[in-house]
């Protein structure tokens, strides 16, 4: 009895809340029906991103899932490229293929930065900033 209560006191609140955070994310993600109205999706993504920022370090995770679910944000060819196709291109180590992959990735990033500029800003900072501060 004593051990369990002391452990609960020691563990920070965000660790004890993790299961609820995960279930919340899954519940919110179920709201995305692939191929519904873009306007509704845009609203959902902003609300969802706000939730993710409060519960997870980087909202890019949500954006990645969102992009794979919604081909309208890129062009269809980006979504039709499965991870298998990508791994085949990389495993061949063909220079031309790797250029094609990086080109499509750059184009996808341009779409992301155009549609969600705030996402890229929030993602570039959290990982690099605190570590440099702690080392000093």
From Swiss-Prot:
Regarding tissue, the record states: Testis specific. Expressed in cancer cell lines.
Protein name in the entry? Cancer/testis antigen 62
| Source species taxonomy | Eukaryota, Metazoa, Chordata, Craniata, Vertebrata
The ranges of region (Disordered) come to 1-22
Q: Which domain of life is it from?
A: Eukaryota
